[in-house]
């Protein structure tokens, strides 16, 4: 697939099946762990640090799987799923720019939760700003991110780290 600046749900599913960046390279998780419905913009320049950016969206629907179990009679999207979406997006970005290997989250410096996603909400928007990209034997992205719910920033993550590994045997 050619490098584009936006991706549909069906194209994200191709990535989840390993059909986008080639065998053994970056993949997104399959649903229900795929935490966004589309990538609305991805670019290797721009963003807060001029090192690249990616924006994705999740349509919030009351029938999303996590609302039934987190929590019974008090449905809320788990914060860790928003954080995982951010790692997913950094991994996608590394594959999109040509990095080789399987993606693994390597950590995060700081996370702040200032709000919640509830079944009546409409739209989650993730914004990732790459701070540093290493494309050598080590392939790694470091980024800051925000998650908005219906236009209000509710999560912030600084120094998200994702690496691509050609072998995960010793990981």
Curated annotation (Swiss-Prot):
Its main location: cytoplasm. Disulfide bonds: none annotated. Transmembrane segments: none annotated. GO terms for biological process: unsaturated fatty acid biosynthetic process. Signal peptide: none annotated. GO terms for cellular component: cytoplasm. Keywords: Cytoplasm, Fatty acid biosynthesis, Fatty acid metabolism, Isomerase, Lipid biosynthesis, Lipid metabolism, Lyase. It is found in: Cytoplasm. GO terms for molecular function: (3R)-hydroxyacyl-[acyl-carrier-protein] dehydratase activity; trans-2-decenoyl-acyl-carrier-protein isomerase activity. It catalyses: a (3R)-hydroxyacyl-[ACP] = a (2E)-enoyl-[ACP] + H2O; (3R)-hydroxydecanoyl-[ACP] = (2E)-decenoyl-[ACP] + H2O; (2E)-decenoyl-[ACP] = (3Z)-decenoyl-[ACP]. Its EC number is 4.2.1.59, 5.3.3.14. The active site is at residue 70. Pathway: Lipid metabolism; fatty acid biosynthesis. It holds the Pfam family FabA. InterPro entries: FabA (IPR010083), FabA_FabZ (IPR013114), HotDog_dom_sf (IPR029069). PANTHER family: 3-HYDROXYACYL-[ACYL-CARRIER-PROTEIN] DEHYDRATASE (PTHR30272), 3-HYDROXYDECANOYL-[ACYL-CARRIER-PROTEIN] DEHYDRATASE (PTHR30272:SF8). HAMAP family: FabA. Homodimer. Necessary for the introduction of cis unsaturation into fatty acids. Catalyzes the dehydration of (3R)-3-hydroxydecanoyl-ACP to E-(2)-decenoyl-ACP and then its isomerization to Z-(3)-decenoyl-ACP. Can catalyze the dehydratase reaction for beta-hydroxyacyl-ACPs with saturated chain lengths up to 16:0, being most active on intermediate chain length. Belongs to the thioester dehydratase family. FabA subfamily. This is 3-hydroxydecanoyl-[acyl-carrier-protein] dehydratase. It comes from Methylococcus capsulatus (strain ATCC 33009 / NCIMB 11132 / Bath).
């Amino acid at each position: 697939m050619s490098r584009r600046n936006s991706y549909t749900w069906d194209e994200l599913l191709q990535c989840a099946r390993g059909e986008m960046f080639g065998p053994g390279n970056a993949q997104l998780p399959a649903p229900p762990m795929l935490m966004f419905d589309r990538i609305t913009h991805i670019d290797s320049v721009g963003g807060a640090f001029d090192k690249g950016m990616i924006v994705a969206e999740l349509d919030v629907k009351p029938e999303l799987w996590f609302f039934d179990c987190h929590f019974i009679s008090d449905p809320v999207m788990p914060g860790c799923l928003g954080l995982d979406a951010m790692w997913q997006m950094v991994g996608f970005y590394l594959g999109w720019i040509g990095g080789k290997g399987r993606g693994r989250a390597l950590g995060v410096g700081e996370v702040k939760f200032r709000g919640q996603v509830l079944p009546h909400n409409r739209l989650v928007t993730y914004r990732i700003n790459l701070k540093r990209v290493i494309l050598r034997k080590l392939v790694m992205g470091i980024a800051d991110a925000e998650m908005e719910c219906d236009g209000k920033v509710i999560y912030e993550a600084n120094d998200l780290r994702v690496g691509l590994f050609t072998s995960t045997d010793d990981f």
